[in-house]
Amino acid sequence: MKRFIPPAVAFLMAVLYLSMAAYATAEPEATTGSAPVAENLEITTYRGVSVGGVLSAVDPEGDSLTFTVTTPPSKGTLEVEEDGHFVYTPDPGRRGKDYFGYKALDSEGNSSQEATVIIRLVKQKTKVTYSDMAGDCGACAAVTLAERGIFTGENLAGSYVFSPDTPVTRSQFLAMCMELSGAPLLQDVSATGFADDGEIDAWAKPYVSTALKSGVISGYTDGETAAVFGAERPISVGEAAVILDRALDLTDTSVVWSAYEEAVPTWASQSMSDLAACGMLPHGVSAASASLTRVQAAEMLTEAMRVLDER
């Protein structure tokens, strides 16, 4: 005996059957990759002093990343570039800790979890603040050099200025590196052994002689046979990298930062690679031959302090 199925029920059964068949045979949607993973960070600056940093995230597929702030800071102002470089400036009178949240976005639109950046606001030991460094990403680095007794800018009519874009001389940078390394200086140095010894200031000679004896520097030739130091010549980024690398005795790395591969001479490539691996190369450097500025030197040396503190 055939069972009678009402037309309406038969129609619904047919629709259900076709829907199930289509679901069973449909190809799964293509995935757009995994979400990036953002890193929690901690930085320190002085009360009222701007500090720069770089947001960090890793994408499993190696996609390019951009960054966006999800939770703003409550004790200061924040400027963030799409590539992750940021500047945080504490509000006057604020102390303790502050923080902000951010996410990383890949080219497929995948978003990371929210990561946090904790900022510690500490009290200075000195009263050195620079009137020409307000809101500058290198302000904290500049003040840190003064705090550590390595370099202090000029005091003009009761106000300190750092002159961040001023080129650093070879003798100035060498002296800062030797002070940072803690190497004992040779005493009562009257002659360094370089052909241009007469052009080297008396205050710099102990640094030059100590660095020469320890292999930190070797000088260069100016077209003649005798080696010269060139104390008052502006130091290049590549030269500074070699001196700092040797002064800190960094471990050689095989990693070469891609941005420098075609702009680094052979004699500087290892040192540039070593500093890049340790995060010591300053933001905005375009070539090894460029003159190193004061603010770039400050950034390099404060990162070097971090490396030494972690040893």
Name each model-derived stretch.
Residues 3-24:
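Sec-dependent N-terminal signal peptides of Gram-positive bacterial secreted proteins and lipoproteins
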Residues 23-35, 41-42, 118-139, 152-174, ...:
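Feature responds to low-complexity, polar/acidic, surface-exposed segments characteristic
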Residues 32-70:
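Extracellular ectodomain surface segments
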Residues 39, 97-98, 110-117:
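Extracellular and select intracellular beta-sandwich modules with Ser/Thr-enriched
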Residues 70-83, 154:
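Low-complexity "stalk/linker" and mucin-like segments enriched in Ser/Thr/Pro/Ala/Gly
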Residues 84-88:
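Short strand-edge motifs at loop-to-beta-strand transitions and within beta-strands
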Residues 92-96:
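Surface-exposed, short loops/turns at beta-strand junctions within beta-sandwich domains
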Residues 104-106:
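Conserved structural position at the C-terminal beta-strand
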